[in-house]
Swiss-Prot record:
InterPro entries: Aminoacid_DH-like_N_sf, NAD(P)-bd_dom_sf, THF_DH/CycHdrlase, THF_DH/CycHdrlase_cat_dom, THF_DH/CycHdrlase_CS, THF_DH/CycHdrlase_NAD-bd_dom. PROSITE patterns: THF_DHG_CYH_2. GO terms for cellular component: cytosol. GO terms for molecular function: methenyltetrahydrofolate cyclohydrolase activity; methylenetetrahydrofolate dehydrogenase (NADP+) activity. Homodimer. The lineage of its organism: Bacteria, Pseudomonadati, Pseudomonadota, Gammaproteobacteria, Chromatiales. The gene is folD. The keyword Oxidoreductase applies. It catalyses: (6R)-5,10-methylene-5,6,7,8-tetrahydrofolate + NADP(+) = (6R)-5,10-methenyltetrahydrofolate + NADPH; (6R)-5,10-methenyltetrahydrofolate + H2O = (6R)-10-formyltetrahydrofolate + H(+). Its EC number is 1.5.1.5, 3.5.4.9. Belongs to the tetrahydrofolate dehydrogenase/cyclohydrolase family. It comes from Nitrosococcus oceani (strain ATCC 19707 / BCRC 17464 / JCM 30415 / NCIMB 11848 / C-107). CDD domains: NAD_bind_m-THF_DH_Cyclohyd. Pathway: One-carbon metabolism; tetrahydrofolate interconversion. This is Bifunctional protein FolD.
Amino acid sequence: MSANILDGKAIAANIRRNIKKRVQERITAGLRPPGLAVILLGSDPASQVYVRNKRRACEEVGFKSLAYDLPADTTQANLLALIDQLNADSTVDGILVQLPLGGHIDAEQVIEQIRPDKDVDGFHPYNIGRLTLRLPLLRPCTPHGVITLLRTTGQDLRGLEAVVVGASNIVGRPMMLELLLAGCTVTICHRWTRDLHKPISEADIVVAAVGKPHLIQGKWIKPGATVIDVGFTRQPDGTLTGDVEFESARQRALWITPVPGGVGPMTIATLLQNTLYATEKLHE
């Protein structure tokens, strides 16, 4: 058996087309386009690539894209003041601060400074709390993008056994909440988990989000399972490698995401969805 490929790039392109159409309809009706402000601190090459991709996606669908590229030595006070300025700007529907930040910046305070209704990354404690209470508003982009991918398989997710490998605040923990909301029975694994292969071998859905190349062996995958590889590591030759042994896992899984081209495009597509939602449902 060779798994079906979950083509996040193609699915995300369709989402972006629908968003672009909706933005054009808004402009035709005399309404303003959604506005997204993206803040980049410093010149980390990986962060610059991520931010460039997000800004390009915004412009392609017709959003108003605001770029704030700040020097690495920007103070906490100045960064918070900029966020306050954007919070008060009625033409800005979403504020995104590219993580990670410098060691002198308190990232949690920065996230909490963003108005919850403009937190299109879905990281604010208010938005995580609503997701916990099964009242989602603006949802974390990567986890919700994964749910969108899973829905495209046509499976009924209710009652399925799901394993999340990785317990970060960005992906692992909100991923657990999204899967619970979808009706899955969820196990979350982390650095202290013993015998990692055991829960994985029983899982109908495996979401890997660690950033450790080939952590998950293909032979661990339950036949017919769905494998979502969120993690990626850039190798010395420039190629990207996921957390899962792709080729061997592909021989056992029913569905699997590639790296790259799987989850990454869905994260950006969900960011655009969140920004449009904030515009139409929270700011009008």
